[in-house]
Design a protein with these regions (language model features):
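Hydrophobic/aromatic residues positioned on beta-strands within the core alpha/beta folds
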Residues: 78-80
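Active-site residues of response regulator receiver
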Residues: 7, 53-54
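Acidic catalytic/metal-coordinating carboxylates
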Residues: 34, 60-63
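Acidic, metal-coordinating helix/loop segments flanking the phosphotransfer/catalytic sites
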Residues: 31-49
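Alpha4 helix (beta4-alpha4-beta5 surface) of REC/receiver domains from two-component response regulators
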Residues: 63, 82-99, 103, 107-110
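Two-component/phosphorelay signaling modules centered on CheY-like receiver
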Residues: 10-30
Length: 120
């Protein structure tokens, strides 16, 4: 599974990369700190999954999700946020899953593996 990380905080991206690099079959193929970079990388890389900070600078999250979907429909998007109220907003906008940044890493991995099982 090829994963693109999108979060404005370098520390969060580093922690996600470290976590995911421990998992067999998961390859981090790119990182973005803002919306414009995310869209450019998503178009070039065409990842299986985007881990999207729901508060990523440079665009409204729902608009950014729509742009991702219009460019490459096959990509799954899991929204991440430290705001619990963002969960329903993200799900209503059409993300495939939502994981709070405060949840244990196992929750993120479970959402990712559920996608992988469904995609096989």
């Amino acid at each position: 599974m090829h994963v693109l990380l999108a979060d404005d905080q370098a520390g969060v991206r580093s922690a996600l990369r470290f976590l995911l690099e421990q998992e067999p079959g998961i390859i981090v193929v790119g990182e973005a700190a803002e919306a414009e970079t995310l869209l450019a990388q998503e178009m070039a890389i065409q990842p299986d999954l985007v881990l999207l900070d729901w508060e990523l600078p440079g665009s409204q999250a729902a608009d950014l999700l729509l742009a991702l979907r219009l460019r490459y429909r096959r990509t799954m998007v899991i929204a991440l946020s430290g705001r619990p109220e963002a969960c329903q907003e993200a799900l209503d906008a059409g993300v495939d899953a939502f994981v709070s940044k405060g949840e244990p890493p196992e929750h993120l991995l479970a959402a990712m593996y559920a996608f992988k099982r469904g995609g096989d």
